[in-house]
């Protein structure tokens, strides 16, 4: 192959023609735009002006926090709250004439005819986060996006989807599921390209792209930008993107460049003028340096030392002044008069929208696809009513209707029919919405392709059969006959209709709750409190006739009152009669006591139907009004004064940091200074075996599929230098790091199979040994605690990882590390999450690195450490890593997508992987250049060597011809390396000849490097401090802990206060005692709001061997228990003192005690299920079933349970607490009147005092004994939770 043939692999390609219809051309004109954060009055972007004609590709460049994303958002009108802006932004429709001119390229013909110019102007926006459905394949995602955004024929849409798949290099993964953290699918780069495709499919005139190349390898990034350039040139589209690290050939594809630094414009003009402009002010781009990297370095402020910061800030100020002068004297912006006379288009009109019923059709089809591909949710959907119906039927199994207790049980089972199933569905559907559906809706709503009403209607249609109809039918079919209700078809189907409408109402309530807040802890609070009020108004717990007047009206707006009342009327009207006088029928008397009319059928059914529709209507209105937006970053003000410490002798802090690490008088450091570890991988293979249940009915229930991830990888990684693993997306780079660091985890449906050897200095080690001496920086930063600041995160990590140092030494090292990583400017900013914006993605990456750098390990693994970072920050991070290698002899291995050319030359060894994990090369950069030159692949001048090699090893799937030629090239390179390995006799050493470390010899040699966990007391104290800080800052967590329990007490007080001493008050006291079981659910919900984030952070710390399970568990309890105790005291104030139960010290403290214990048991159950399952939707479903069964078995609902169920009740805390509360509620000295009912024939009262009630209902218990037992039950719950966590992490390891 000649140099001419291979010289420019990236550009010698066959061009595709995309079948997009013509679009109107749009130009963008901005004048004096300034963007200010309204909360802090901080200027985020200062005086930005430009003219961008149609057919242009513009890039906004700059370091992290320079205002790139903010500028894009304002230009696209994506941020309204939290920001104010001055200046003008105008979109102008350019006059292109009715026919294309001769210079324009010819267009493809669709459906055999030439399409006219599209009338509707469309704008698209690619956000920084990829919001995709994990259970759709790549092709399905694009197909549904096309169906939602294009009003074209099926053939046209299919053609465009296939062309985009090829153009974006997604052909190899077109039928792969997108996946998520739990179920791996597409790589990060593939997801990014797919997101670009979902926006491009709408055929936009103007498109904004926020970091489109983040996570892409250099070759994929180049092809994506090349596609944008082609679309701009051919169709006159306008593309505006923010970009971190454009390779040099990407830079020269751009038409216009804007460089920002700290919100100030450093340059904003045509790309052709960029280099001459900087040369004119004295800055010449050095040879063999990417101009983009040079310009970003030039305009960045280096905050790693005071001296550097002052110098670079001064240079930046000079650059800004130069640009203002140039803009005023040389830049020729179009006159305002021209813009004013042109046709201006409002951005609100630049959205795509199908007719309503087409939206509904597409969304329904997608929902069906998603629902039936989610096996776990589908199974639980049908299992839940089956289990809960069976157990509920067993609890209330055919009660004796001739006794008072039996009739009370019958009433309770009717209440359970209306409330139980629909409440469980409310919780489940709320979580399913928060976890899966609403994020996709928010993205599509922001794009203008979906309306709230279409979303709600489509979702309801798709879930109607499986959820509303099937779940209700299963539940009613089981419970109706087990309850021993009348075998009448009309009554059976009427009960089905009532329960069906109740579940429909709860479905609407869940939609309303999520419309109010996308955060589950808030949405569940809305749903829970609403449902609690509605269940209180149903008339079962507190008699609807005698409710306090100020809440009596609630029954008329409570669908539960209508549903419970109509079932009571259907069951008891003219029933249990012993005489012809209907008024004396026991059933009619019960209806009279509860205040429901006889034969009350039609009206409540109609009202129920109205409520079921009404909740959805209110939810739709809130969704229309409440478009989700992200708030501006929050800053936590430090209480301490900021003391700037000057570096002695002007030494840079990162050098001081490195000196501190090993020059302190620490025995570990002195020993470790000279340890050098050469890592050798021999014949590493990795494959994953997928077991897909129910995927192919013909082949059986399970379908097995094997995927090769790594194949015979042999590599050497040397100490004292950075070793890089390079390759295109999907080549197994991250998988190799996970394998050698012992972080591969098999699941039920995906088993990893590995083989090969890992050597330390030619002696074989196990994965566990490797893990003990290495630190691993993962690609994912989601485990960071959102409520902590940067400084706090590193401070707490240092306290646990550097426990051999004094506090002053730890603080100094933390401060130095913050400066070294360039985080000084945001050290007091919170980390943030998807709901509250904190630091940028690049800054999160550096925080994660900082935590691991504190460990000071001999081996450091980093997965994509520069992904999402600007070139200046990337260079800074790699400079820090290089110093660690050089001065401390560490072995550092990184995976990297787009290394700068000057950094690539400084790498130690490079492992180049092709797709499917096959080795293309392993050696030094100089050896690499020489090797590929021998193969005939000479790197052209002014080309980044790393980019060139990545281009060589990448397969271009944009069209068949490109694919054939690129695959042949890749196969040739792979075959050549295999032959080279064989010739050099580098085959692996036979297993029998390998030296292997024993466990003892390894720990003897590397004992000073094996991380020793912090002692229990220290880890406990640090965990308490950290969790206290996160709880204090997180309003949601605090409210979940403190507000929900007293909130219930307030509601109970509203409905029950004052509890009287008459016949009706008996059922009210029973109801109030039964309502205390709701605290079981509150404990679980509090756990769901607080525990998962703490758990995820703890798992990372545990994997790093920082501390054990006990400190985390005890610290969590230390914060949880006092807050629960405080909430329980407030609860008792409302339920005992306000409601008017016996106001004695014994009753008050017994209520505090019982409510505290029940809440703690709910928390413990939450810990158990959150440990078993990491998927919260499944957790909610499982735990809700357990809790519901527990509350139904409390002993106050069903008064005649079987002996087996009574046996289960021994470990049911609410079984004990309900009995304690009811015995204190009916003391022997409580005198009852019977003017309103309950008189014997001789005129005496059936229940003269509290003891009579307890005896009659069989509720007399030894309260002292029960008070002792429930402590034991609570302790048993906690111990079970602890041992389940221990089993997960230490014993079984699932």
UniProtKB/Swiss-Prot annotation:
The protein, known as: Uncharacterized ABC transporter ATP-binding protein/permease YOL075C
Gene Ontology biological process terms in this record: transmembrane transport
UniProt keyword annotation of NADP present: no
Topology relative to the membrane: Multi-pass membrane protein
Amino-acid positions noted as binding ATP 2 in the UniProt annotation, renumbered to this chain: 727-734
Chain ranges of the ABC transporter domain: 28-287, 679-941
GO molecular function: ABC-type transporter activity; ATP binding; ATP hydrolysis activity; ATPase-coupled transmembrane transporter activity
Top-level taxonomic group: Eukaryota
The species this protein was found in: Saccharomyces cerevisiae (strain ATCC 204508 / S288c)
């Amino acid at each position: 192959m000649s140099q001419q043939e291979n010289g420019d692999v990236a550009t010698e390609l066959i061009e595709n023609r995309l079948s997009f219809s013509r679009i109107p051309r749009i130009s963008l004109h901005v004048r004096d735009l300034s963007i200010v954060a309204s909360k802090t009055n901080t200027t985020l972007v200062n005086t930005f002006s430009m003219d961008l004609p149609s057919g242009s590709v513009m890039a906004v460049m700059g370091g992290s926090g320079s205002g790139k994303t903010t500028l894009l958002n304002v230009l696209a009108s994506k941020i309204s709250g939290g920001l104010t802006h001055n200046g003008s932004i105008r979109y102008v429709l350019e006059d292109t004439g009715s026919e294309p001119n001769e210079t324009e390229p010819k267009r493809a013909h669709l459906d055999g005819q030439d399409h006219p110019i599209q009338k509707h102007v469309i704008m698209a926006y690619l956000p920084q986060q990829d919001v995709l459905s994990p259970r759709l394949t790549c092709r399905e995602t694009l197909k549904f996006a096309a169906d939602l955004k294009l009003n074209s024929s099926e053939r046209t849409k299919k053609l465009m989807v296939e062309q985009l798949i090829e153009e974006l290099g997604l052909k190899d993964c077109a039928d792969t599921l997108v996946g998520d953290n739990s179920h791996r699918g597409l790589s990060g780069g593939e997801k990014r390209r797919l997101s670009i495709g979902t926006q491009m499919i709408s055929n936009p005139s103007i498109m904004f792209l926020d970091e489109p190349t983040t996570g892409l390898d250099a070759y994929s990034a180049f092809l994506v930008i090349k596609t944008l350039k082609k679309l701009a040139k051919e169709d006159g589209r306008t593309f505006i993107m923010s970009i971190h690290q454009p390779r040099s050939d990407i830079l020269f594809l751009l038409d216009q460049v804007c460089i920002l630094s700290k919100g100030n414009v450093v340059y904003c003009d045509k790309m052709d003028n960029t280099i001459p402009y900087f040369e004119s002010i004295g800055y010449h781009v050095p040879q063999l340096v990417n101009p983009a990297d040079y310009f970003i370095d030039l305009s960045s402020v280096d905050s790693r030392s005071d001296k550097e910061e002052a110098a670079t800030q001064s240079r930046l100020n000079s650059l800004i002044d130069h640009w203002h002068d140039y803009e005023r004297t040389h830049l020729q912006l179009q006159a305002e008069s021209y813009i004013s006379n042109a046709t201006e288009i409002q951005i609100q009109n630049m959205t795509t929208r199908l007719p309503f019923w087409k939206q509904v059709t597409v969304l329904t089809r997608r929902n069906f696809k998603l629902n039936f591909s989610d096996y776990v949710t589908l199974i639980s959907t049908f299992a839940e009513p089956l289990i809960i119906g069976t157990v509920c039927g067993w609890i209330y199994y055919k009660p004796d209707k001739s006794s008072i207790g039996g009739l009370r049980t019958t009433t309770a089972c009717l209440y359970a029919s209306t409330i139980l199933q629909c409440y469980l569905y409310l919780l489940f559907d709320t979580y399913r919405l928060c976890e899966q559906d609403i994020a996709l809706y928010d993205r599509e709503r922001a794009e203008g392709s979906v309306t709230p009403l279409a979303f709600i209607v489509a979702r309801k249609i798709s879930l109607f059969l499986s959820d509303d109809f099937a779940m209700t039918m299963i539940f009613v079919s089981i419970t109706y006959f087990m309850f021993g209700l009348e075998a009448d078809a009309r009554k059976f189907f009427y009960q089905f209709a009532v329960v069906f409408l109740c579940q429909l109402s709860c479905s609407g309530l869940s939609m309303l709750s999520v419309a109010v807040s996308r955060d589950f802890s808030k949405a569940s609070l809305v749903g829970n409190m609403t449902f609690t009020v509605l269940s209180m108004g149903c008339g079962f717990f507190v008699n609807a006739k005698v409710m306090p007047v100020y809440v009596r009206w609630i029954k008329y707006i409570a669908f539960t009152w209508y549903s419970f009342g109509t079932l009571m009327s259907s069951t008891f009207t003219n029933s249990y009669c012993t005489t012809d006088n209907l008024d004396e029928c026991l059933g009619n008397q019960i209806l009279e006591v509860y205040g429901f009319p006889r034969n009350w059928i039609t009206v409540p059914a109609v009202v129920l139907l109205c409520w079921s529709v009404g909740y959805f209507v209110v939810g739709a209105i809130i969704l229309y009004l409440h478009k989700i937006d992200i708030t501006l970053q929050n800053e936590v003000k430090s209480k301490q004064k900021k003391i700037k410490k000057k570096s002695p002798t002007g030494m840079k802090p990162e050098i001081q940091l490195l000196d501190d690490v090993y020059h302190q008088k620490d025995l570990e450091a002195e020993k470790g200074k000279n340890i050098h570890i050469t890592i050798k991988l021999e014949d590493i293979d990795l494959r994953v075996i997928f077991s897909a249940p129910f995927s192919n009915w013909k082949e059986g229930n399970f379908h097995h599929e094997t995927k090769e991830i790594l194949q015979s990888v042999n590599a050497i990684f040397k100490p004292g230098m950075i070793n890089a693993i390079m390759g295109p997306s999907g080549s197994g780079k991250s998988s190799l790091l996970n394998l050698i660091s012992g972080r591969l985890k098999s699941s039920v449906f995906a088993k990893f199979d590995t083989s090969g050897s890992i050597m330390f200095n030619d002696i074989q080690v196990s994965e566990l040994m490797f893990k003990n001496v290495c630190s691993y920086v993962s690609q994912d930063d989601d485990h960071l605690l959102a409520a902590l600041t940067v400084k706090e995160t590193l401070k707490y990590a240092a306290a646990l990882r550097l426990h051999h140092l004094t506090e002053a030494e730890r603080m100094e090292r933390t401060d130095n590390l913050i400066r070294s990583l360039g985080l000084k400017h945001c050290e007091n900013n919170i980390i943030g999450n998807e709901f509250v914006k904190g630091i940028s993605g690049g800054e999160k990456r550096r925080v994660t690195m900082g935590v691991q750098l504190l460990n000071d390990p001999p081996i450091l693994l980093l997965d994509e450490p520069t992904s999402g970072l600007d070139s200046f920050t990337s260079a800074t991070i790699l400079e820090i890593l290089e110093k660690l290698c050089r001065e401390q002899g560490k072995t550092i291995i990184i995976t990297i997508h787009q290394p700068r050319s000057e950094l690539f030359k400084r790498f130690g060894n490079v492992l180049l992987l092709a797709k499917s994990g096959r080795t293309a090369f392993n050696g030094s950069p100089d050896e690499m250049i020489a090797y590929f030159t021998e193969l005939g692949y000479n790197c052209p001048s002014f080309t980044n060597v790393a980019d060139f090699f990545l281009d060589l090893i990448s397969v271009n799937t944009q069209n068949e011809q490109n694919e054939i030629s690129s695959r042949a090239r890749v196969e040739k390179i792979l075959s050549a390396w295999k032959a080279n390995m064989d010739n050099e006799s580098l085959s692996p050493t036979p297993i029998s000849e390998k030296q292997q470390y024993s466990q003892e010899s390894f720990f003897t040699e590397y004992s000073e490097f094996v991380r020793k966990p912090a002692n229990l007391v220290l880890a406990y104290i640090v965990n308490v401090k950290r969790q206290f800080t996160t709880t204090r800052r997180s309003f949601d967590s605090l409210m979940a802990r403190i507000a929900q329990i007293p909130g219930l007490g307030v509601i109970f007080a509203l409905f029950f206060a004052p509890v009287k001493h008459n016949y009706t008050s008996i059922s009210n006291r029973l109801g109030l005692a039964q309502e205390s079981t709701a605290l079981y659910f509150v404990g679980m919900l509090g756990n769901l709001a607080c525990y998962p984030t703490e758990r995820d952070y703890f798992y990372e710390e545990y994997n790093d061997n920082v501390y054990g399970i006990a400190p985390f568990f005890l610290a969590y309890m230390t914060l949880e228990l006092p807050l629960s105790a405080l909430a329980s005291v407030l609860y008792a104030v409302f339920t005992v003192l306000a409601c008017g139960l016996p106001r004695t010290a014994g009753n008050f403290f017994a209520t505090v005690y019982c409510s505290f214990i029940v809440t703690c048991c709910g928390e413990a159950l939450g810990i158990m299920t959150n440990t078993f399952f990491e998927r919260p939707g499944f957790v909610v479903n499982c735990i809700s079933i357990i809790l519901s069964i527990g509350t139904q078995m409390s002993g106050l609902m069903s008064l005649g349970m079987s002996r087996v169920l009574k046996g289960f009740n021994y470990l049911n805390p609410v079984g004990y607490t309900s009995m304690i509360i009811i015995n204190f509620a009916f003391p022997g000295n409580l005198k009852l009147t019977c003017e309103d009912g309950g008189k014997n024939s001789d005129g005496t009262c059936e229940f003269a005092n509290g003891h009579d009630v307890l005896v009659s209902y069989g509720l007399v218990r030894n309260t002292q004994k029960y008070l002792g037992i429930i402590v034991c039950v609570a302790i048993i719950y906690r111990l079970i939770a602890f041992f389940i966590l221990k089993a997960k992490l230490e014993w079984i390891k699932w």
